[in-house]
């Protein structure tokens, strides 16, 4: 069986206009996949050079396949049908290592056609590393490497204003573009680079903050033989991902034209502020996950897919989203509903086995950041507590007993909560404290909740009532009236 390369698999090749820091699965099934579609359907005509930003020889370089690889996008489409779509990606030309090919790396800045910089260097990538110097070959941190590359560009083109870059980081931190820009400016000042360079950074370059959303499941180790048989070739860089994707970019309106999104619309939004989209994702996608997990798991289910195929649990989650989360969010209702509909479809994806216990990690913090804001906003708006979000809190407290149908399961959270719950549930079993007292102790933890939740009218009582029903009748019976 042949391995992918451009000699045996000839096809389009595009001039290099994009630098990408990061060789991982996410960017390949997200950014490079979108660039490939735009190259095929428009005159974007842009090839990608992947820069490996860390010193490692694993995985091997994408250049061993001349930049070619296959994405397999699978899940439920807009009509709810299971689809699996294989695509040979031709947008990447080559990969270089900033460690072993430093001169080649700097040379990227000399190419007048270069226009975009994308990156995903993990959440820890956009950070300051003390001791990074201008003359390091290379510096340790990504922002320092980028500063050096930008200075190379500035110098080579004598500060020409039409030679700046559009820089689009995809790292999962808030306002990633602003964070990256601040670090580049910090290095520029620390290295005493000329004032003209700092002005050029501001005038000629755009640092765009983003929100990225797609579950990328990566190399399908268990199915490789079958998939390669279907494809008819060997591909060491196969990359799988879900059908859904969303790319929100906070940047100039002209970006839509520059990326040719006006000619071939993708699910890419160019917006003035990513904040409401971030809130929407946290509240609906992450919030639904967090509400679902303790309820579904204690109802005897193990994966998100099983939960969504269970009529009662699915109804509980959908009602929580549409009746209790969406009404308190600050975006047009139709936008929120179409996003929610995509979310429930993603949860049903038959190709992804998402274990409930793995999502349960750090559930106390997740509840505070993802559900509590909507619970409190609903109480404020209506004068009554949202029934399902409140029930989810009771289910979460019950979950920390660590026992289902007489069998124990691992609970993962910080040591404080694990010890606290062990003590509280032990006292509850020994009848030293009652349910209401247990709930009050949990809700009074100001350090965790950042407020005293026992002061929210009726919250202790309602959570305690729900918890009592869960303990007496089991989760199935307890949740039924809310389905």
Swiss-Prot record:
Organism classification: Bacteria, Pseudomonadati, Pseudomonadota, Gammaproteobacteria, Enterobacterales
SUPFAM superfamilies: 6-phosphogluconate dehydrogenase C-terminal domain-like (SSF48179), NAD(P)-binding Rossmann-fold domains (SSF51735)
InterPro entries documented for this protein: 6-PGluconate_DH-like_C_sf, 6PGD_dom2, Altronate_OxRdtase, Mannitol_DH_C, Mannitol_DH_N, NAD(P)-bd_dom_sf
Amino-acid positions noted as binding NAD(+) in the UniProt annotation, renumbered to this chain: 18-29
One Gene Ontology biological process: D-galacturonate catabolic process
HAMAP family: Altron_oxidoreduct
Keyword line: NAD, Oxidoreductase
Gene that encodes it: uxaB
Keyword Ribosomal protein: no
Catalysis: reaction(s): D-altronate + NAD(+) = keto-D-tagaturonate + NADH + H(+)
Listed EC numbers: 1.1.1.58
Family the UniProt entry places it in: Belongs to the mannitol dehydrogenase family. UxaB subfamily.
Signal peptide: none
MF annotations from Gene Ontology: mannitol-1-phosphate 5-dehydrogenase activity; tagaturonate reductase activity
UniProt protein name: Altronate oxidoreductase
